[in-house]
A protein has these predicted regions:
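Catalytic core of non-heme Fe(II) oxygenases with the double-stranded beta-helix
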Residues: 69-179
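Non-heme Fe(II)/2-oxoglutarate
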Residues: 1-83
């Protein structure tokens, strides 16, 4: 069973993050994809160094700091700075892939081994159709579509994908943890 963490940010924090990222300019999501995953990645992403990304990231990190479930579920030694993605329109899916085993922060050049992948849903499930996170693990395929503010943790070595979004926008924060 994959750890599901309910209500990671407060309602106010979630509202603030959505206000920040909704007003931002999004880029092609391939900016952070590895060579192989770039072939199946089709979404939008906030540039890591933009003001909006930095502001939203600080709110997410503060929420993680307060979450006992996150600490016990991920055992974080290092957290790769949270990123933000958006699936809608023609940039609406991410095919089967495995996350890179090591991520390098382009701003600090620090390396993070990716033991645990984290997806924090920022859109309510009724705001979009499709967009399910499908994770293949030893127990089969698990389909995840959580309320805004909820987060799922899963092994970074798992094959996973985001199903096409056919209506609305699926917005999330995603990041990796070195345990």
């Amino acid at each position: 069973m994959l750890p599901h963490l309910p209500s990671v940010p407060t309602a106010d924090e979630l509202h603030r993050v959505r206000g920040i990222v909704d007003a931002a300019r999004w880029s092609d999501g391939k900016i952070t994809a590895g060579t192989q995953s770039a072939q199946v990645k089709n979404n939008r992403q906030l540039p890591q160094d933009c003001r909006e990304s930095r502001e939203a990231r600080e709110i997410v990190l503060a929420a993680l700091d307060r979450s006992a479930l996150f600490v016990t579920g991920a055992l974080p030694h290092r957290i790769f700075p949270p990123l933000f993605n958006r699936y809608e329109g023609s940039a609406n899916a991410f095919g089967n892939h495995v996350d890179n085993s090591v991520r390098t922060d382009p701003l600090t050049r620090e390396h993070t081994r990716t033991d645990v992948s984290c997806t924090l849903f920022l859109s309510a499930p009724e705001d979009y159709d499709g967009g399910e996170l499908v994770i293949e693990d030893t127990f089969g395929c698990q389909t995840v579509k959580l309320p805004a503010g909820d987060m799922i943790l899963y092994p970074s070595s798992s094959v996973h994908r985001v199903e096409p979004v056919t209506r609305g926008a699926r917005i999330a924060s995603f990041f990796w943890v070195q345990s």
